[in-house]
């Protein structure tokens, strides 16, 4: 009798432990990438070679507005566009392309983008080829606070 009581007690405790444990999975949603703001170039590569020291990009500024307009300041270096206009990203959470349409044109120019986090700050990486497909530029932008 004691043996049956002992086994039934162990079985009851085991069942209580089994049914009391619930596994829940936290769903982590990818945040929307905030591309709006004023950006400055911190690194330039051409065909995977760092040419930052040879490019005068100190005054270059790219401002992406909340209203999907962009402005360029001191644009004296190769870039996708040469004048102000409107911009769009292909996906707010997982953007892979950034498109620019100058005000004085109906043509849209698109560059591939990445949004790496460096030192806890989201950066903007734009890859494009201005005219010559043999040359590929990568501009790493840092948001100006």
Range-by-range predicted roles:
Residues 22-82, 92-145:
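Lipid interaction determinants
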Residues 1-9:
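Bacterial N-terminal signal peptides that target proteins for export
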Residues 17-20:
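C-terminal motif of bacterial Sec signal peptides marking the signal peptidase cleavage site
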């Amino acid at each position: 009798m004691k043996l049956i009581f002992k086994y039934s007690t162990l079985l009851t405790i085991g069942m209580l432990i089994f049914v009391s444990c619930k596994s829940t999975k936290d769903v982590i949603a990818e945040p929307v990438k905030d591309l709006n703001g004023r950006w400055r170039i911190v690194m330039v590569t051409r065909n995977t070679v760092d040419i930052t020291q040879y490019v005068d990009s100190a005054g270059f500024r790219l401002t992406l507005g909340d209203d999907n307009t962009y402005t360029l300041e001191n644009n004296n270096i190769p870039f996708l566009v040469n004048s102000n206009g409107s911009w769009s990203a292909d996906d707010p959470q997982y953007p892979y392309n950034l498109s620019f349409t100058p005000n004085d044109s109906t043509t849209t120019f698109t560059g591939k983008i990445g949004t790496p986090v460096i030192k806890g700050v989201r950066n903007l990486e734009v890859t494009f080829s201005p005219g010559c497909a043999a040359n590929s530029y990568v501009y790493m932008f840092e948001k100006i606070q």
